[in-house]
Amino acid sequence: MGKFLSAFQNSIWNFLLMILLLGTHIYFTVKLKFIQKRIPEGIVLSFSNKNQGEGGISPYASLATALAATIGTGNIIGISTAIAIGGPGAVFWCWITGIFGIATCYAECFLAVRYRVKKENGTYAGGAMYVLERVLHKRKTALFFALLTVAASFGIGSSVQSHAIGAAVTEKIAKVCTFLVPVMSFLYLGGCFFLIFKNAAVVPKAVAVIVQTAFTSKSVTGGIAGTAVMTGIRVGISKGLFTNEAGMGSIAMSAADAKTTSPVKQGIISMTGVFWDTVVMCAVTGITIVSSMLKNPESYRNIKSDQLCFKAFSFMPAGEWILLISLVLFAFATIIGWSYYGECAAGYLFGEKGIEIYQLIFIVTVYLGAVMSLETVWGIADIFNSLMAVPNILSLLLLRKVIIRETVSDRKKNAPESKRLL
């Protein structure tokens, strides 16, 4: 089973999915005039309470829910594995891919808010399945996407959730995420910055090594062996594409219920999640590990790929405990975030009563996840999660003119008068 899943994943990566996602990222980056430059604006808007419209949760709560699902163990273990397999240069390609992914995240969240649907309890529902059915009239494709979302939520994480449904559940999940995301992020990043400060003398060299090994397979000093450039590119891009979920359609579901009057503004807020997840978290993790490897080369000989970050944190007081607690919080947050996505998809497929059935099955997967091999569980989850990208990107490309036209219009409308005359 494990070999089959591995072969299936590799076939997707090598031929179709990487090209599809990366191509979409680059396309929207170009067509939206490098919308990534509005990240500072998005950060400010995410903490603002001004001009909030209808919706179930605040823009910040929507962002926190998305971050809870995306900032997971992949940011730690995933980067460790990427460095072990693809060399330090993999961090560079992960970072670059994340930057391009910001544009796609904006596009999918824009559509989710633009075509969201108001439910009986006053909250809003949206995402690729609603866009595919109500706008593009592709119901079968919409059902396929929703089924993949439910399946992915079972694999990525399962936990005992409340049986209450409706607005109260969404609000509770959002409240937990608004508290949990800052706590776990500050705890983990605090440990990373402590180590970066401790290894300050070799940090510039670590950054240089990351950039150098992204383009050359020659060995570098400090006990870090060179790796084939193409391996580093493949591994780095794959981690960059999937750690932040840009293009998968999952983040858009939380954006749809945000209290907002503007799809453009919510899109800008939501795209900051990719910035925090990949550009910040993955970059900091990479620099922490590589600088530690340069400072303590002997300690990293014959070490398992998923233990690189643990080894780095072992060089600070209580570091391994800090990392362990961070991992537990990240995993718990992912469970909460993906349970919300699963409920959104189940509600679309079966109505509000279907959410109760989904929650019961979600509980059962706690046991299944414990008895199945970790490789099998994650292999299945990765496949479903990967396949979600296909119908989601279909909706993005078919509605690309709407996304581009309204984004450009909003930019002109809000630009200073001097710029409008140019």
Task: Please provide the spans of the model-predicted regions.
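N-terminal alpha-helical transmembrane segments of multi-pass membrane transport
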Residues: 1-69, 73, 83-90, 101, ...
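Membrane-interface loop-to-helix entry segments
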Residues: 20-27, 35-44, 164-211, 346, ...
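Helix-loop-helix module between adjacent transmembrane segments
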Residues: 24, 28-29, 68, 97-122, ...
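Transmembrane helix-loop junctions in multi-pass membrane proteins
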Residues: 31-36, 74-79, 155-167, 171-175, ...
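Flexible loop linkers connecting adjacent transmembrane helices
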Residues: 34-57, 81-83, 87-91, 95, ...
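Alpha-helical membrane segments and immediately flanking helix-loop junctions
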Residues: 53-85, 111-129, 133, 147-150, ...
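Selective recognition of specific alpha-helical transmembrane segments in multi-pass small-molecule
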Residues: 100-108, 171, 181-201, 234, ...
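Extracellular/periplasmic helix-exit of transmembrane alpha-helices
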Residues: 107-120, 191-209, 221-224, 257-260, ...
